[in-house]
């Protein structure tokens, strides 16, 4: 299941405090509406809707040596058997369920006075914080694969996204083979040589790098992205030095033991109502080569 399987459009804007506290699904809808705009975890990983049992998921990382058999198939002659083929099986790994959430209190006075704006701000802050944590964990998972040397890596000696010049003084224009998109093309070629069916569709960078890309390429950028079939996305948890190319259909998975859930309960001694929201994800990298990284040798400070 996804982060919020029953995700619905919340078009009424501000939440009615009493209605929300009586029916927490209203708050769930609001959090889901806010989160879906920036929920990176479901952008870079495929969502697996199968149930999670036992608080963990057993999975394996597939590399090119696991994708084909060690020996080749052979032609069969009449009356013969086909050749027995063998392959190296990847080692099983264990991903444990994580549990992230928070709660806030609404006083009876705020409820009675229908303090809508403060309540909506509290809900929005909780939604933003849960989203931030899930995005942070997604990028930490990707970065761990990079640090372990499992991803497709390219250290490029050409111009960085900040340094590239594609117009202006002809003497200052960066040669085509030294431009960042040349590095992107080389990564695509490397992935194709692996013959694993990888199709990168996300170009993931830091906010500053995204600004540099837009500034450098201007109106030519949409055409370049379309050429490669890429969507440009950014995250605060990406290092300015790194550019990620991701095939979300193959890179990894995210499952939820419990998706986005909101509950509320009375705290009669303090004459207030608690609102609690949480999600319990589990994620893992299943095909590290579906994540590529480009690191430019020269990068302006």
Question: Where are the predicted features?
Answer:
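Sequence/fold signature of self-assembling virion shell proteins
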Residues: 2-11, 15-20, 211-301
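Short, well-ordered loop/turn elements at secondary-structure boundaries
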Residues: 100, 197-199, 239
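Long, contiguous amphipathic alpha-helices that act as assembly "spine/axial" helices in icosahedral shell
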Residues: 87-151, 271-281
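N-terminal catalytic cores of peptidoglycan-degrading enzymes
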Residues: 1-54, 267-268
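Extended, solvent-exposed, turn-rich assembly/linker loops in the middle of proteins
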Residues: 147-228
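Assembly/oligomerization interface modules of large self-assembling protein complexes
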Residues: 28-100
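Intrinsically disordered or highly flexible coil/loop and linker segments, enriched in small
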Residues: 40, 44, 136-139, 197-200, ...
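Structured loops at beta-to-helix junctions and adjacent beta-edge loops in soluble globular domains
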Residues: 62, 107, 206-208, 235, ...
